């Protein structure tokens, strides 16, 4: 399943998101959700042991001036790769 997070993590039920993550899922951070990808962020730390891949939209990272602060554990994707993710994961959950 592809989970998308367009909001800062404190504005959603992040513990529920963590509970619903399954092996092989992906989490795509976009809009204000890219703040989760900042190195040392407590929400990112809680994702470290999850059996998923965390992606963040490059355009939203750049728009917020966060390029140098994003963790190396997060895969940066552009809009084309975003579309590929939506095709790869038939099921999606927006937070």
Swiss-Prot record:
Listed under GO biological process in this entry are: tRNA wobble position uridine thiolation
Keywords in UniProt for this one? Cytoplasm, tRNA processing
For this UniProt entry, what is the primary localization, expressed as one broad class?
Answer: cytoplasm
- Pfam families, A to Z: DsrH
InterPro entries per the UniProt record, alphabetical: DsrEFH-like, Sulphur_relay_TusB, Sulphur_relay_TusB/DsrH
- Would the keyword Transmembrane helix be found if you checked this record's keyword annotation? no
Compartments in which it is found: Cytoplasm
Q: Which GO terms describe its cellular component?
A: sulfurtransferase complex
Disulfide bond entries: none
So what does this one do? Answer: Part of a sulfur-relay system required for 2-thiolation of 5-methylaminomethyl-2-thiouridine (mnm(5)s(2)U) at tRNA wobble positions.
Listed PANTHER family? PROTEIN TUSB
Query: Of which family is this protein a member?
Result: Belongs to the DsrH/TusB family.
Q: How does it assemble?
A: Heterohexamer, formed by a dimer of trimers. The hexameric TusBCD complex contains 2 copies each of TusB, TusC and TusD. The TusBCD complex interacts with TusE.
What is the protein name for this chain?
Protein TusB
The protein's organism comes out as: Salmonella arizonae (strain ATCC BAA-731 / CDC346-86 / RSK2980)
